[in-house]
Amino acid sequence: MDSEAQARFDLIASNLQEFLNPEIIEKILIEKRSPRVYWGTATTGRPHIGYFLPALKIAQLLKADCEVTVLLADIHGFLDNLKAPLELVDNRAIYYRNVVTALVQSVGVDTSKLNFVLGSSYQKSPEYVMDVYRMASMVSESAAKKAGAEVVKQTGNAPLSGLLYPILQVLDEQHLNADCQLGGVDQRKLFTHNPYSAATEWLPKLGYSVRAHIMNPMMAGLGGQKMSSSDGADAKIDLLDTAEAVAKKIKKAECFPKIVEDNGVLSIVENILFPAAVLNGHGEFRVERRDAEPLVYTSIAQVKEDYAKDLLTPQILKPAVSAAMVSLMAPIQAAYEASADWQEITLKAYPPPVVHKKVKKVKDRGSRFPGAKQENAKPEEAKPAEDAPTEQLAQTSI
Ligand SMILES: N[C@@H](Cc1ccc(O)cc1)C(=O)O
């Protein structure tokens, strides 16, 4: 590889946890072509700051002159235990498109060449559907189950659609004509046969070629574990959260002094703030101190070292992370404020829950309590006590 190809390769490979079959990409770069990479996202819950990871990777891929496609996987949102009901899925796809575009633009990368494809636009074609049937006849039920174990919601009497999900995701590589698929490391079992069978083993069964796979690390959540859309509102930061909400959530986050592992706050610095700072051109993370010069970092290794020594304490780290996140999210929020369409689609994609007003139960004190109106007394007395049998039943069942 010449130095230009090497620089492109390094950008593609940066900040990854795993890169499978890199030789596929190397060959394309040596031939001075543009690798075609796709990232799929099931259009379900509201995207949180964890979406910065794929978005920053997409920004790097665009800079490395890759052809990038974002698959708005509406059908997958529905196949996965109905996480996104069919009637909301279209609006959610538009919401995701706006979010991903704004995320990539927030680090100054042009999105005019970023391609968006809606899953349902090709996953219902006769060719695609026939491939689903062919693959379903060649892949065992247990392999499909294992492949989806970390991605598809696991329930007792799971719907059959959860077994189709991995088959469709694997076929997308072929039908989107990709050289490489990007995903979080949680997608690993869908990507490779080690330890389970999926894309790299299933595609050749239909005569299709094996693709490269690039995997982002998973962010630790603010409560310590992997960040997920199904976390409670306090454990994840929504991209449209106000500065106060961001500060409050980070302040509450689990962040033990000197402990670097599974630390959600440090995970933000490592996986979001540094890669974004590099794309933004300054490459720095600053921590202000009250009585001393600010600490200025240019690598996560230095940050972790100082944190382990308690020179960088949770008390000074947290406000620095809040401030940096708020300024990183500012252009996304400005884009939202400036777009009446986006605001309208938000309401349609995530309709506020209908609150059933609680009607205050008026205690039935009967008609004989002191002060009861005399005229009510008679008819009430004449009526048989309707509640009595239920009350008895409830008592016996206790
Ligand atoms: N499995 C991805 C979504 C996805 C769907 C289809 C694909 O082809 C790729 C990715 C997720 O967890 O969100």
State the predicted function of each range.
Residues 1-215, 277-293, 301-398:
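NTP-dependent nucleotidyl-transfer catalytic core
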